[in-house]
């Protein structure tokens, strides 16, 4: 089936994926659509790729750094944030295709610590009440955000700083913390956006393959696609090409989010772990 994909990567959503790929084609399809937003200041900058049976058009619009008037370029690096979840989905899908996994398998088949879960009923003053989960947690549930896990589970523990892209813990440790923590509702009954669930999915990949999730991702997905600059720990050279992080406001210029943890954190420090929920 033919696909037409327009990918707009705006500079308020950093992505550590840039590589020397197609050059700016200097064509006008996206530029005509996006330039007014750059001119008004609502959009700091963007890279567009128009794809139909191959790359038809690429265009760079605006700035990687508004204050310094540094133009955005095809080789700038961005942080993907939650788009990392899709990469985890690909690794799961590969195992499903190979017959090594079913989406309706219990998570406890691969991670026994999830066999018994506790649901938090509520909290009155300092007293919290729980009940043993009645529903079986499946692989599908942790991937589609219906497992009952909060956005960042490791941030709830005082012995682990942050969670996911903000520090957190290795995949298997994050999964173990999640299994030992109360969930928000019965698995499969509601939905809440969760990096934790995706990290649990990555932990399942580690169990089946016997490899660290990030190494499996690199070997089976990133390297075959030629995504040489896509990784959890960018080099100092890559960081010199990163775009600044901006927030958008309706009818107002984009503002640099100076106090934003994602912008201020050391991207390649030793405490940064390969979160499947938001690490690339």
Q: Which residues fall in each region the model found?
A:
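Bacterial Sec-dependent N-terminal signal peptides
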Residues: 1-23
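Alpha-helix N-cap and coil->helix boundary residues
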Residues: 29, 102-106, 212-217
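Conserved catalytic cores of very large enzyme subunits
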Residues: 21, 82, 221
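Short, conserved catalytic-motif segment at the N-terminal edge
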Residues: 23-79, 100, 116-122, 179-180, ...
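Active-site SXXK
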Residues: 34, 53-56, 76-107, 198-206
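Short, surface-exposed loop or secondary-structure junction motifs
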Residues: 58, 118-280
């Amino acid at each position: 089936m033919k696909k037409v994909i327009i990918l707009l990567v705006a500079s308020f959503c950093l992505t550590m994926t840039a590589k020397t790929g197609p050059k700016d084609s200097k064509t006008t399809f996206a530029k005509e659509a996006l330039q007014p937003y750059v001119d008004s200041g609502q959009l700091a900058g963007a890279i567009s790729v128009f794809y139909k049976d191959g790359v038809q058009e690429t265009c760079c619009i605006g700035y990687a750094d508004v204050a310094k008037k540094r133009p955005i370029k095809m080789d700038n690096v961005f942080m993907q944030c939650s788009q990392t979840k899709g990469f985890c989905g690909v690794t799961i899908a590969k195992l499903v295709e190979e017959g090594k996994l079913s989406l309706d398998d219990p998570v406890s088949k691969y991670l026994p610590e999830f066999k018994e879960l506790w649901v938090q009923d509520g909290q009155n003053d300092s007293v919290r009440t729980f009940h043993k989960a009645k529903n079986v947690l499946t692989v599908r549930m942790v991937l589609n955000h219906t497992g009952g896990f909060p956005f960042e589970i490791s941030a709830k523990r005082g012995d682990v700083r942050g969670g996911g892209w903000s520090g957190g813990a290795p995949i298997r440790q994050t999964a173990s913390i999640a299994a030992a923590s109360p969930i928000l509702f019965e698995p499969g009954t509601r939905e809440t956006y969760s990096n934790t669930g995706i990290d649990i999915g990555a932990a399942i990949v580690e169990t089946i393959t016997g490899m660290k999730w990030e190494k499996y991702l690199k070997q089976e997905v990133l390297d075959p696609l030629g995504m040489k600059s896509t990784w959890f720990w960018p080099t100092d050279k890559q960081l010199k090409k990163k775009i600044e992080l901006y927030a958008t406001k309706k009818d107002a210029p984009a503002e640099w989010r100076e106090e934003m943890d994602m912008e201020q954190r050391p991207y390649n420090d030793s405490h940064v772990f390969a979160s499947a929920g938001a690490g690339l």
